[in-house]
Amino acid sequence: MNKELLLGVNIDHIATIRQARGTRYPDPVQAAMDAEEAGADGITLHMREDLRHIQARDVRLIKQVLQTRMNLELAVTEAMLDFAEEILPEHACLVPEKREELTTEGGLDILTHRNVVERAVRRLQLMGSEVSLFIDPDKEQIRAAVDVGAPVIELHTGCYADATSEEKQHYELQRIKEAAEFAASLNLVVNAGHGLHYHNVKPIAAIRELNELNIGHAIIARALFCGLKEAVRHMRQLMQEARLYVND
Protein backbone atom coordinates (compact mmCIF):
# COMPACT_ATOMS: atom_id res chain seq x y z
CA MET A 1 0.00 0.00 0.00
CA ASN A 2 1.34 3.43 -0.94
CA LYS A 3 2.07 5.87 1.84
CA GLU A 4 -0.37 8.76 1.93
CA LEU A 5 1.01 12.03 0.61
CA LEU A 6 0.23 14.88 2.99
CA LEU A 7 -0.97 18.33 1.96
CA GLY A 8 0.18 21.46 3.75
CA VAL A 9 -1.91 24.45 2.69
CA ASN A 10 -0.07 27.77 2.63
CA ILE A 11 -2.42 30.64 3.48
CA ASP A 12 -0.01 33.56 2.94
CA HIS A 13 -2.00 34.98 0.04
CA ILE A 14 -5.17 35.32 2.04
CA ALA A 15 -3.14 37.85 4.00
CA THR A 16 -1.77 39.35 0.77
CA ILE A 17 -5.31 40.30 -0.27
CA ARG A 18 -6.04 41.76 3.16
CA GLN A 19 -2.82 43.79 3.30
CA ALA A 20 -3.48 45.24 -0.17
CA ARG A 21 -6.19 47.42 1.39
CA GLY A 22 -5.17 47.37 5.02
CA THR A 23 -8.50 45.87 6.05
CA ARG A 24 -9.37 43.22 8.63
CA TYR A 25 -10.56 40.82 5.94
CA PRO A 26 -10.11 38.25 4.52
CA ASP A 27 -9.04 36.56 7.73
CA PRO A 28 -6.15 34.05 7.55
CA VAL A 29 -7.42 32.47 10.76
CA GLN A 30 -10.73 31.59 9.11
CA ALA A 31 -8.85 30.35 6.06
CA ALA A 32 -6.75 28.04 8.21
CA MET A 33 -9.84 26.54 9.83
CA ASP A 34 -11.61 26.10 6.49
CA ALA A 35 -8.55 24.44 4.95
CA GLU A 36 -8.35 22.03 7.86
CA GLU A 37 -12.03 21.20 7.57
CA ALA A 38 -11.53 20.42 3.87
CA GLY A 39 -8.75 17.95 4.63
CA ALA A 40 -5.48 19.88 4.88
CA ASP A 41 -2.97 17.94 6.95
CA GLY A 42 -1.31 21.12 8.16
CA ILE A 43 -1.19 24.87 7.68
CA THR A 44 1.91 26.57 6.33
CA LEU A 45 2.58 30.27 6.73
CA HIS A 46 5.60 32.45 6.14
CA MET A 47 6.01 35.52 8.31
CA ARG A 48 8.49 37.52 6.28
CA GLU A 49 10.65 40.17 7.92
CA ASP A 50 8.97 42.90 5.83
CA LEU A 51 5.52 41.70 7.00
CA ARG A 52 4.16 41.94 3.47
CA HIS A 53 1.39 39.44 4.18
CA ILE A 54 1.30 37.31 7.35
CA GLN A 55 1.47 39.35 10.57
CA ALA A 56 2.59 38.27 14.03
CA ARG A 57 -1.01 38.43 15.24
CA ASP A 58 -2.06 35.95 12.53
CA VAL A 59 0.53 33.43 13.65
CA ARG A 60 -0.41 33.75 17.32
CA LEU A 61 -4.12 33.29 16.66
CA ILE A 62 -3.69 30.44 14.18
CA LYS A 63 -1.46 28.58 16.60
CA GLN A 64 -4.27 28.73 19.17
CA VAL A 65 -7.03 27.39 16.90
CA LEU A 66 -5.31 24.77 14.72
CA GLN A 67 -6.48 21.19 15.08
CA THR A 68 -3.68 19.83 12.88
CA ARG A 69 -0.23 21.42 12.96
CA MET A 70 1.54 24.62 12.04
CA ASN A 71 4.49 24.75 9.66
CA LEU A 72 6.08 28.15 10.21
CA GLU A 73 8.44 29.29 7.47
CA LEU A 74 11.05 31.77 8.64
CA ALA A 75 14.31 33.39 7.67
CA VAL A 76 17.50 32.53 9.51
CA THR A 77 17.61 35.69 11.63
CA GLU A 78 17.67 36.35 15.36
CA ALA A 79 14.37 38.24 15.20
CA MET A 80 12.57 35.37 13.49
CA LEU A 81 14.08 32.77 15.79
CA ASP A 82 13.02 34.84 18.80
CA PHE A 83 9.49 34.91 17.41
CA ALA A 84 9.52 31.14 16.84
CA GLU A 85 10.56 30.72 20.46
CA GLU A 86 7.38 32.56 21.46
CA ILE A 87 5.11 30.58 19.11
CA LEU A 88 6.68 27.11 19.44
CA PRO A 89 5.44 25.79 16.08
CA GLU A 90 5.21 22.04 15.61
CA HIS A 91 7.24 22.42 12.42
CA ALA A 92 9.66 25.17 11.43
CA CYS A 93 11.06 25.50 7.92
CA LEU A 94 14.11 27.69 7.40
CA VAL A 95 13.97 29.55 4.08
CA PRO A 96 16.09 32.16 2.28
CA GLU A 97 14.60 35.63 2.11
CA LYS A 98 15.24 38.79 0.08
CA ARG A 99 13.16 41.91 0.53
CA GLU A 100 13.15 42.68 -3.21
CA GLU A 101 11.79 39.27 -4.32
CA LEU A 102 8.13 38.69 -5.17
CA THR A 103 8.33 35.17 -3.79
CA THR A 104 11.06 32.85 -2.56
CA GLU A 105 13.44 32.56 -5.52
CA GLY A 106 15.51 29.53 -4.57
CA GLY A 107 16.63 27.21 -1.85
CA LEU A 108 18.62 27.93 1.27
CA ASP A 109 22.37 27.78 0.62
CA ILE A 110 23.49 25.64 3.54
CA LEU A 111 26.99 25.20 2.13
CA THR A 112 27.66 28.94 2.29
CA HIS A 113 25.88 29.63 5.57
CA ARG A 114 26.51 26.36 7.37
CA ASN A 115 27.39 27.73 10.82
CA VAL A 116 24.42 30.09 10.96
CA VAL A 117 22.01 27.41 9.73
CA GLU A 118 23.37 24.82 12.14
CA ARG A 119 22.88 27.15 15.11
CA ALA A 120 19.33 27.91 13.98
CA VAL A 121 18.51 24.22 13.60
CA ARG A 122 19.76 23.47 17.10
CA ARG A 123 17.87 26.37 18.61
CA LEU A 124 14.60 25.35 16.97
CA GLN A 125 15.06 21.75 18.03
CA LEU A 126 15.57 22.85 21.63
CA MET A 127 12.16 24.55 21.36
CA GLY A 128 10.63 21.22 20.39
CA SER A 129 10.05 22.07 16.73
CA GLU A 130 10.70 19.60 13.94
CA VAL A 131 13.07 21.48 11.64
CA SER A 132 12.96 21.48 7.86
CA LEU A 133 15.32 23.18 5.41
CA PHE A 134 13.98 24.53 2.11
CA ILE A 135 16.67 23.66 -0.43
CA ASP A 136 17.24 23.16 -4.14
CA PRO A 137 17.26 19.56 -5.41
CA ASP A 138 21.03 19.35 -5.14
CA LYS A 139 22.96 16.47 -3.58
CA GLU A 140 25.57 18.69 -1.95
CA GLN A 141 22.88 20.76 -0.25
CA ILE A 142 21.16 17.56 0.86
CA ARG A 143 24.38 16.26 2.40
CA ALA A 144 24.82 19.61 4.12
CA ALA A 145 21.29 19.36 5.55
CA VAL A 146 22.27 16.07 7.17
CA ASP A 147 25.50 17.59 8.46
CA VAL A 148 23.70 20.45 10.25
CA GLY A 149 21.27 18.03 11.89
CA ALA A 150 18.01 18.73 10.07
CA PRO A 151 15.71 15.68 9.95
CA VAL A 152 13.50 17.09 7.18
CA ILE A 153 14.08 18.89 3.89
CA GLU A 154 11.67 20.57 1.52
CA LEU A 155 12.75 20.42 -2.10
CA HIS A 156 12.25 23.62 -4.07
CA THR A 157 10.06 22.80 -7.07
CA GLY A 158 10.11 26.29 -8.57
CA CYS A 159 12.35 25.49 -11.55
CA TYR A 160 10.06 22.59 -12.46
CA ALA A 161 6.96 24.76 -12.10
CA ASP A 162 8.44 27.63 -14.12
CA ALA A 163 9.82 25.49 -16.97
CA THR A 164 8.80 26.88 -20.35
CA SER A 165 9.26 23.69 -22.37
CA GLU A 166 8.46 20.01 -21.94
CA GLU A 167 12.16 19.16 -22.15
CA LYS A 168 13.07 21.60 -19.40
CA GLN A 169 10.19 20.45 -17.21
CA HIS A 170 11.18 16.80 -17.67
CA TYR A 171 14.77 17.65 -16.77
CA GLU A 172 13.71 19.44 -13.60
CA LEU A 173 11.33 16.62 -12.67
CA GLN A 174 14.20 14.14 -12.93
CA ARG A 175 16.35 16.36 -10.71
CA ILE A 176 13.63 16.36 -8.06
CA LYS A 177 13.13 12.59 -8.32
CA GLU A 178 16.84 11.89 -7.97
CA ALA A 179 17.17 14.34 -5.09
CA ALA A 180 14.21 12.77 -3.29
CA GLU A 181 15.65 9.28 -3.71
CA PHE A 182 19.06 10.42 -2.49
CA ALA A 183 17.63 12.23 0.53
CA ALA A 184 15.47 9.26 1.48
CA SER A 185 18.55 7.03 1.30
CA LEU A 186 20.07 9.29 3.98
CA ASN A 187 16.97 8.80 6.15
CA LEU A 188 15.68 12.32 5.64
CA VAL A 189 11.97 13.07 5.54
CA VAL A 190 11.42 14.68 2.14
CA ASN A 191 8.78 17.31 1.42
CA ALA A 192 8.42 19.52 -1.65
CA GLY A 193 6.81 22.74 -2.73
CA HIS A 194 6.82 26.05 -4.58
CA GLY A 195 4.91 26.88 -7.73
CA LEU A 196 2.86 23.68 -7.75
CA HIS A 197 -0.65 23.97 -9.17
CA TYR A 198 -3.52 21.86 -10.46
CA HIS A 199 -1.91 21.17 -13.85
CA ASN A 200 1.60 20.23 -12.72
CA VAL A 201 1.18 18.61 -9.32
CA LYS A 202 0.60 15.00 -10.38
CA PRO A 203 4.12 14.13 -11.60
CA ILE A 204 5.53 15.51 -8.34
CA ALA A 205 2.91 13.77 -6.22
CA ALA A 206 3.83 10.47 -7.89
CA ILE A 207 7.36 10.59 -6.46
CA ARG A 208 7.13 7.83 -3.87
CA GLU A 209 9.78 9.27 -1.52
CA LEU A 210 7.86 12.48 -0.91
CA ASN A 211 6.05 12.85 2.40
CA GLU A 212 4.25 16.18 1.98
CA LEU A 213 3.57 18.91 -0.56
CA ASN A 214 3.18 22.52 0.54
CA ILE A 215 0.93 24.44 -1.83
CA GLY A 216 -0.57 27.89 -1.44
CA HIS A 217 -0.89 30.35 -4.32
CA ALA A 218 -2.66 27.95 -6.68
CA ILE A 219 -5.16 26.88 -4.02
CA ILE A 220 -5.97 30.46 -3.01
CA ALA A 221 -6.33 31.44 -6.68
CA ARG A 222 -8.70 28.53 -7.36
CA ALA A 223 -10.66 29.43 -4.22
CA LEU A 224 -11.71 32.73 -5.82
CA PHE A 225 -13.90 30.75 -8.19
CA CYS A 226 -15.01 27.70 -6.22
CA GLY A 227 -14.37 28.46 -2.56
CA LEU A 228 -11.43 27.49 -0.38
CA LYS A 229 -12.79 24.18 0.85
CA GLU A 230 -13.47 22.92 -2.66
CA ALA A 231 -10.06 24.14 -3.83
CA VAL A 232 -8.35 22.17 -1.06
CA ARG A 233 -10.42 19.05 -1.75
CA HIS A 234 -9.61 19.19 -5.46
CA MET A 235 -5.88 19.43 -4.80
CA ARG A 236 -6.03 16.51 -2.38
CA GLN A 237 -7.90 14.48 -4.98
CA LEU A 238 -5.23 15.10 -7.63
CA MET A 239 -2.49 14.11 -5.19
CA GLN A 240 -4.32 10.94 -4.21
CA GLU A 241 -4.92 10.00 -7.85
CA ALA A 242 -1.20 10.40 -8.57
CA ARG A 243 -0.32 8.07 -5.71
CA LEU A 244 -2.58 5.31 -7.05
CA TYR A 245 -0.10 4.66 -9.87
CA VAL A 246 3.01 4.53 -7.71
CA ASN A 247 4.45 1.05 -7.32
CA ASP A 248 5.27 -0.20 -3.84
Swiss-Prot record:
Homooctamer; tetramer of dimers. One of its GO terms (biological process) is pyridoxine biosynthetic process. It holds the Pfam family PdxJ. Its main location: cytoplasm. One of its GO terms (cellular component) is cytosol. This is Pyridoxine 5'-phosphate synthase. 1-deoxy-D-xylulose 5-phosphate binds at residues 12-13, 48, 53, 103. It is an enzyme of class 2 (transferase). Catalyzes the complicated ring closure reaction between the two acyclic compounds 1-deoxy-D-xylulose-5-phosphate (DXP) and 3-amino-2-oxopropyl phosphate (1-amino-acetone-3-phosphate or AAP) to form pyridoxine 5'-phosphate (PNP) and inorganic phosphate. The record marks 154 as: Transition state stabilizer. It is found in: Cytoplasm. Gene3D superfamilies: Aldolase class I (3.20.20.70). GO terms for molecular function: pyridoxine 5'-phosphate synthase activity. Keywords: Cytoplasm, Pyridoxine biosynthesis, Transferase. It comes from the Bacteria. Its EC number is 2.6.99.2. The active site is at residues 46, 73, 194. 3-amino-2-oxopropyl phosphate binds at residues 10, 21, 195, 216-217. It catalyses: 3-amino-2-oxopropyl phosphate + 1-deoxy-D-xylulose 5-phosphate = pyridoxine 5'-phosphate + phosphate + 2 H2O + H(+). Pathway: Cofactor biosynthesis; pyridoxine 5'-phosphate biosynthesis; pyridoxine 5'-phosphate from D-erythrose 4-phosphate: step 5/5. Belongs to the PNP synthase family.
